[in-house]
Amino acid sequence: WIHTAKSLGAKYAVLVAKHCSGFSLWPTTAHEYSIKNSPYKNGKGDIVAEFVASCRKYGIKPGIYASTTANGFLHVDNPGLVKKGSPVTQEEYNKIVETQLTELWSNYGKLFEIWFDGGVLSQQNGGADILTLIQRLQPNSIAFQGPYGYPNLIRWVGNEEGNSPYPCWATADATTSADGVQKIKGLYGNPHGNYWCPG
């Protein structure tokens, strides 16, 4: 796939390492719902490692998508809050998030882009300490809908068709850049904003 992406002129690629179901494409130590308990390579596979190796082989910058706001396996729903009936507490889920992000951001080298998709639950609102982790482990990566206060954010433009509103300013203010998520009124950015946060 990366060879094909390269032949099409791609400069970077993003792998969905963990979507909202909670299944992890790497052998995470955080829980058992991962590739290590699948028949792929007799439980010894690591698709994230294979993806990153292929990116490096073909000169493509690797990125990783890992949803933290939803996890069907652990009964966690957007914006990252544990639901009634979950096998884990909020504190335990936050530890799982921090463990998994540490694994992804420590074990596979420099990442060009990190996708959160759906934003992140801030620590002030009961979420994991994602800002400290990303600043320590991947300080140069750009982050789609990343934590408030991270300087390299890119933001949602309000739809999944790729059509941005007009005008769409590449700067934003504290209100329109929070968690990288744009409320409907903030989809345009802010021409006088202090934050570089393109959509």
Model-found features: residue ranges?
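Mature catalytic domains of secreted/periplasmic carbohydrate-active enzymes
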Residues: W1-G199
